Curated annotation (Swiss-Prot):
It comes from Homo sapiens (Human). GO terms for molecular function: DNA binding. It comes from the Eukaryota. One of its GO terms (biological process) is lens development in camera-type eye. This is Lens epithelial cell protein LEP503. It holds the Pfam family LEP503. May play a role in lens epithelial cell differentiation.
Amino acid sequence: MQPRTQPLAQTLPFFLGGAPRDTGLRVPVIKMGTGWEGFQRTLKEVAYILLCCWCIKELLD
């Protein structure tokens, strides 16, 4: 006999499982400026993440 399972939507928190669209929770919109500024910010964030990963790897070795 297989264990009884619930549909995924019922097991997720309310904000992921199918809550009404207008719950009053709003995500702030961050203006990135021009396309070049947004690209620079993205590159900086990627470089920061890679540097952190490299540092963690070095610490664990």
